[in-house]
A protein has these predicted regions:
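N-terminal secretory signal peptides that target proteins for export/translocation
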Residues: 1-8
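Bacterial N-terminal signal peptides
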Residues: 9-22
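Sec/Tat signal peptide C-region and signal peptidase I cleavage site
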Residues: 24-28
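M16 family metallopeptidases and their MPP-like homologs
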Residues: 46, 51-67, 73-77, 91-135, ...
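Active-site SXXK
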Residues: 72-86
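Non-catalytic, conformational "gating/processing" segments within enzyme and secreted inhibitor domains
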Residues: 150, 200-235, 440
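His/Glu-based metal-binding/catalytic segments typifying zinc-dependent metallopeptidases
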Residues: 158, 175, 244-307
Length: 464
C-alpha cells in the first residue's frame, strides 16, 4: 500500500506524464478500416501483422432483452443451437472443424448482443468465414436436437444459478432493479419458461434476427482491408438482407425510479454474510457527453481495489468487512449499473454497520467529490489498461464489435481515452450527486441460514 507522501507525489507525477503522452501512444495503434456490404453487413478490419493469426468475430444486434415475452432464454438457447448443423456442416462438427484447422472458437450472449468468434491462422480465415456465413442462414434443427440441448441449458442454469447463493442473490436484485425493462430478466432465462422452449421458438427468433443487415463483422490480425473485403463479399455478401429487421430496437423503458428497494435472501449454502447495492444509471449509449466517463472514474476511485475509498474504509480502517468493492457497467444499450458489495468480517449482524459506513462513503463523494490526485491515478490506470489491451487481438476485436453492435461509431470507440482524459473533478462530483441516490437503487443482504432457501422482496417505500 502507498502511504508515504513522497511516494504519493512521485506516483502522481508519473501518472501525469502518462496522461500527457497517452494520446500519442494510442493514436499510433493500427488504423482500422470500415466498410459496408451491399446487404447491410458492417465490416471493421483491425490490422495486426505481428503474427500470422486472425480473430474473426460476428456480432448480432440482438440479445436477451430483445426476446418476446414468455420465451426468456431463447437468445442464449439459440446460441447453443447454432453449433448443431447445416446442410454443409454435420451435427456437432462446427467446433471440431475449427479445432482441426488449428483454431479455437466460442460464443456468448448478453442482454444486447450475441457474438460468435474464432481465432485461427491467416490462411484459414476464408474457411471460417464461409462456415459462419453458412450458419447465419442455413441452420437446420430437429426436435430431438432441440429438446436434448434444452436439457443442457436447464442443467447449466441449475449448476450456475440454483446451486450458487450469490448468483441467486444477483438474479433477485436484478429483477428488483427494473420495473418493466427486460434487463430484469436473466440472460439464461427463467427456468419455468426455459423448460417450454420449442424448435419453433428457436427458428422464429433465428429467422428474424440473424441477418447480415443486423450484424457486425470484425476481423483483427494479419490481414488487410482488401483481403477481408474480398472474402466477406464471397461469403457473407451472398446472403440477402432481411427487410423485417428494423433499424430501431424497441424495448419497454422504465419510469423514473422514486423508491429504494430491498432484497433479503437467506441460504444455508451461503458462506459469509454479504452486503450488496445496485444503482440504475445511464450507459455509454444513453448518458450525456462525458457523463459515462465520469461514472467510470467515480467507481474506479470509490470501489476498485485495495486503494479505493470503500475498501480502505470498510476493510482497513473499520475492519467490519473482509473484502469490498464495486464497478460501473456502462455497456448496455438502454441502462448502465453501479454495483457495490462488501463481505462481512464477522456475523450477519454487522450488515447494518456495513450499510451505514458505505452510505457515508457515498455521501462524501456526493458532497465533496474526489481529489486531483485520485482523479489523476484513476485516469492513468484506465489509459494504461487501454494501451495494454491494444496488444491483445481478441480484446481489440471485442472492443470494436461490442460498441458497434450497440450503435457506437468507430470514432467514438477510438476517442474513449481522450474523453476519459477530459473528465474533471467537478464532472465526477456532479455524477455522484445525481446518481448515487438510493431511490435509484436496490440494497441486498445475503445471509447464511439453517432454513430452506428463500428470497424476499419488500414493497418499495417512498423516501421522505
Amino acid at each position: 500500500m502507498i502511504n508515504s507522501p513522497g511516494v504519493l507525489r512521485l506516483f502522481t507525477w508519473i501518472a501525469s506524464i502518462m496522461l500527457a503522452i497517452a494520446p500519442t501512444q494510442l493514436h499510433a495503434q493500427p488504423r482500422t478500416s470500415e466498410f459496408k456490404l451491399a446487404n447491410g453487413l458492417q465490416v471493421v478490419v483491425i490490422p495486426d501483422h505481428r503474427a500470422p493469426v486472425v480473430t474473426h468475430m460476428i456480432w448480432y444486434k440482438v440479445g436477451a432483452a430483445d426476446e418476446p415475452k414468455g420465451v426468456s432464454g431463447i437468445a442464449h438457447f439459440l446460441e447453443h443451437l447454432m453449433f448443431k448443423s447445416t446442410d454443409k456442416i454435420p451435427l456437432g462438427e462446427f467446433s471440431k472443424i475449427v479445432a482441426r484447422l488449428g483454431g479455437n472458437d466460442n460464443a456468448f450472449t448478453g442482454h444486447d448482443v450475441t457474438s460468435y468468434f474464432q481465432r485461427i491462422s491467416k490462411e484459414r480465415l476464408g474457411t471460417v468465414m464461409e462456415m459462419e456465413a453458412d450458419r447465419m442462414v442455413n441452420l437446420r434443427l430437429t426436435e430431438k436436437e432441440v429438446l436434448t440441448e434444452r436439457d443442457v441449458i436447464l442443467e447449466e442454469r441449475r449448476s450456475r444459478i440454483e446451486n450458487n447463493p450469490a448468483a441467486i442473490m444477483d438474479e433477485q436484485m436484478n429483477a428488483a432493479l427494473y420495473y418493466s425493462h427486460p434487463y430484469g430478466i436473466p440472460v439464461i432465462g427463467w427456468e419455468h419458461e426455459m423448460a417450454k422452449l420449442s424448435p419453433q421458438d428457436a427458428m422464429t427468433f433465428y429467422k428474424h434476427f440473424y441477418a447480415p443487415n443486423n450484424a457486425v463483422l470484425v476481423v483483427a490480425g494479419d490481414v488487410t482491408a482488401d483481403e477481408v473485403k474480398a472474402l466477406a463479399e464471397k461469403t457473407y455478401g451472398q446472403i440477402p438482407a432481411n427487410p423485417t429487421v428494423g433499424a430501431t430496437r424497441f424495448r419497454p423503458q422504465d419510469p423514473p425510479q422514486r423508491a429504494a428497494r430491498r432484497v433479503e435472501y437467506s441460504d444455508p449454502r451461503a458462506g459469509k454474510a454479504s452486503f450488496h447495492r445496485d444503482y440504475v444509471v445511464p450507459s455509454y449509449m444513453t448518458a450525456k457527453p462525458g457523463e459515462a466517463e465520469a461514472l467510470d472514474l467515480l467507481m474506479k476511485i470509490a470501489a476498485d481495489g485495495a486503494t479505493s475509498r470503500l475498501y480502505k474504509r470498510l476493510v482497513v480502517d473499520e475492519k467490519i468487512a473482509s473484502s469490498a468493492g464495486g464497478s460501473y457497467s456502462g455497456s448496455g444499450l438502454d441502462y448502465g449499473t453501479i454495483s457495490l458489495y462488501a463481505v462481512a468480517a464477522g456475523s450477519p449482524a454487522d450488515l447494518p454497520k456495513i450499510e451505514a459506513s458505505l452510505d457515508k462513503v457515498m455521501a462524501e463523494l456526493r458532497d465533496n467529490g474526489v481529489t486531483d490526485a485520485e482523479l489523476t491515478r484513476a485516469k492513468s490506470s484506465y489509459i494504461a489498461d487501454y494501451i495494454y489491451e491494444n496488444d491483445d487481438q481478441a480484446s481489440l476485436a471485442r472492443r470494436y464489435g461490442w460498441g458497434l453492435a450497440l450503435g457506437r461509431t468507430v470514432a467514438q470507440i477510438e476517442g474513449w481515452p481522450d474523453a476519459i482524459s477530459k473528465v474533471t473533478a467537478d464532472d465526477i462530483k456532479k455524477a455522484a450527486s445525481t446518481y448515487l441516490d438510493t431511490r435509484r437503487s436496490v440494497t441486498g443482504y445475503l445471509t447464511p441460514s439453517v432454513e430452506a432457501p428463500r428470497a424476499e422482496q419488500s414493497a418499495p417505500k417512498s423516501r421522505s
